[in-house]
């Protein structure tokens, strides 16, 4: 099993996308080439990257990134969204995403569906409003899937922050193409009130890739807070999650994702904590899970 890192794990350093802290202006603290230089030292085998990391998706820039990854012996996976509201750089059509992934030498392109859900969330699984969106995505996938096959790029549909695992499976079954599968995120099911362990069980057999992450539920006076932590510090049963992936999927890579909150810290301290969380997550995978 190879071990990689989703670049969003360094979002406070300026990588992955702008879901992070918008208060900090100026030059990013790390770019994709610096991370690739450091990846072998960190003990990583690959990176799961976005258009925000590439800075430009022009052919020359993508070739430069691909060459640097090959120099370091790193696999690359590409991550894009159909309608990313927080960072429009990540929004691509299926055709654009496939072309970028192919240029990078990535064999997997992860796709966020970005569904618009009615509330209450717990009552919205396969809601008619959601199904209309899924039908539209299925039509686009039917056109894109042969292109993905020709490019050698598998499309991995994620149970992102707005998708039930059964909806992802419905879409995969609807398209019924060997180059259309899942990306299983070990946390995201919580955000639509689904049991994360059930979602992992459901999606792992159909998954091409993963976001292997951990969150902790913190009870507070007004309710609760779900917050990203280093792997092993949260409430996801990661040992069981890894067992499911090993036993029930064909995946040969684990992609760590850390979603650390800057809190009230300034950029220097927040980035120090983020790096520490990434390093601890890598150690957890190596020393506890024996990846």
Q: Which sequence ranges carry the predicted segments?
A:
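Active-site groove signature of glycoside hydrolases
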Residues: 103-130, 151-165
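N-terminal pre-domain/capping segments
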Residues: 1-108, 132, 139, 177, ...
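Flexible glycine/acidic-rich beta-alpha junction loops that bind and position SAM and/or redox cofactors
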Residues: 12-18, 115-121, 217-224, 255-268
């Amino acid at each position: 099993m190879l071990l990689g890192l989703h670049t969003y794990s360094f979002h406070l350093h300026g990588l992955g996308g702008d879901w992070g802290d918008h208060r900090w202006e100026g030059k990013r603290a790390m770019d994709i080439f610096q991370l690739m230089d450091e990846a072998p030292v960190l003990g990583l085998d690959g990176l799961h990257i976005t258009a925000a990391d590439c800075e430009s998706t022009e052919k020359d820039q993508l070739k430069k990134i691909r060459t640097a990854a090959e120099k370091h012996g790193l696999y690359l996976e590409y991550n894009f969204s159909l309608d990313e509201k927080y960072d429009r750089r990540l929004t691509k059509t299926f055709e654009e995403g496939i072309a970028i992934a192919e240029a990078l030498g990535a064999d997997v392109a992860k796709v966020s569906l970005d569904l618009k859900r009615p509330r209450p969330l717990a009552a919205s699984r396969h809601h008619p409003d959601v199904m209309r969106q899924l039908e539209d995505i299925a039509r686009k996938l039917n056109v894109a899937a042969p292109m993905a096959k020709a490019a050698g790029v598998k499309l991995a549909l994620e149970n992102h922050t707005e998708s039930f695992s059964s909806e992802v499976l419905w879409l995969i079954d609807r398209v019924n193409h060997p180059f259309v599968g899942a990306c299983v995120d070990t946390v995201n099911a919580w955000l639509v009130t689904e049991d994360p362990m059930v979602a992992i069980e459901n999606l792992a057999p159909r998954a091409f890739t993963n976001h292997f992450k951990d969150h902790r539920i913190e009870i507070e006076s007004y309710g609760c807070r779900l917050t990203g932590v280093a792997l092993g510090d949260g409430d996801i049963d990661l040992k069981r999650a890894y067992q499911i992936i090993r036993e029930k999927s064909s995946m040969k890579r684990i992609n760590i994702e850390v979603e650390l909150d800057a809190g009230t810290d300034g950029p220097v301290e927040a980035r120090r904590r983020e790096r520490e969380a990434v390093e601890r997550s890598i150690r957890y995978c190596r020393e506890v899970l024996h990846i």
